[in-house]
């Protein structure tokens, strides 16, 4: 019995040492992967990397990791010099083939997602305007609502509005719905669905020039191509998927 107890103690001790060594190796590898991704993808912030699966060391010996989860902070988007915060930037990578130094990594499958709140999205809109949820029916068509005092919106975008025109416009508000799409995996495009009819010739075209614009997403790994956008009650949610996604090297 004493020998059995000693054997059990040794099993527990060595098992604990193995787990500790395995977790230590994971921690080191996560740092290596984060550094490789940051440098190869040109990111401005340090990604948070979580390598899934146990034991890790046997995965390394097989040169294949079950799953790597990546999250990013400090990601922004820009439009005409206006910066917009992008949150909840995440990527989930499956069946990742690696080499011994982690200098190359390729995921058989990958999914990515990101979020922009309406409050943040409004920072890219013409000054004086707001962007909000357009309601369930229009949201289902990928639309958002843009509104604001017409004269303020035009002037906020740098359009010269003469005093006689201001007097004619009075307190008139502009309220329209823009369709949101995503192009090339990193460009958010807003295009007005319809424009109000105004009593001043040429003003409608000027409004379109103001409210139609592109928002470039910066800091998202170039290998993750977002191709879906959904308008929800709390903002825009983006998603994308890919195969044979290269992460480093």
Predicted features, each with a name:
Residues 119-127, 162-173, 212-222:
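Short, solvent-exposed secondary-structure boundary motifs
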Residues 54, 73-75, 94-96, 149, ...:
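Solvent-exposed coil/turn segments that connect beta secondary-structure elements
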Residues 191-249:
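Extracytoplasmic/luminal low-complexity segments enriched in Pro/Gly and acidic/polar residues
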Residues 44-122, 126-155, 159-163:
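N-terminal beta-strand/beta-hairpin edge segment
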Residues 129-137, 179-181, 227-229:
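Short, exposed beta-strand/loop patches in secreted or surface proteins that constitute
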Residues 29, 33, 45-47, 66-68, ...:
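One face of beta-strands
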Residues 148-203:
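Short helix-loop boundary/capping segments
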């Amino acid at each position: 019995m004493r020998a059995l107890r000693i054997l059990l103690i040794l099993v527990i001790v060595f098992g604990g040492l193995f787990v500790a060594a395995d977790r230590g190796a994971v921690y080191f590898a996560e740092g290596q992967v984060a550094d490789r991704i940051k440098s190869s993808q040109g990111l401005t912030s340090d990604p948070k990397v979580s390598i899934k699966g146990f034991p890790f060391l046997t995965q390394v010996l097989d040169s294949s990791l079950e799953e790597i989860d990546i999250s990013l902070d400090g990601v922004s988007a820009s439009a005409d010099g206006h910066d917009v915060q992008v949150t909840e930037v995440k990527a989930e990578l499956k069946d990742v083939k690696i080499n011994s130094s982690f200098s190359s990594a390729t995921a058989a499958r990958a999914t990515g997602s990101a979020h922009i709140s309406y409050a943040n999205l409004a920072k890219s809109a013409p000054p004086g305007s707001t962007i909000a949820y357009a309601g369930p029916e229009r949201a289902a068509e990928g639309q958002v609502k843009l509104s604001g005092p017409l004269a303020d919106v035009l002037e906020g975008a740098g359009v010269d509005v003469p005093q006689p025109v201001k007097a004619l416009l009075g307190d008139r508000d502009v309220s329209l719905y823009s369709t949101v799409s995503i192009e090339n995996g990193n460009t958010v495009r807003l295009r007005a669905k319809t424009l109000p009819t105004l009593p001043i010739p040429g003003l409608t075209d000027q409004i379109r020039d103001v409210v139609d614009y592109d928002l470039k997403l910066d800091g998202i790994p170039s290998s993750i191509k977002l191709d879906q956008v959904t308008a929800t009650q709390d903002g825009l949610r983006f998603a994308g998927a890919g195969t044979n996604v290269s992460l480093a090297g």
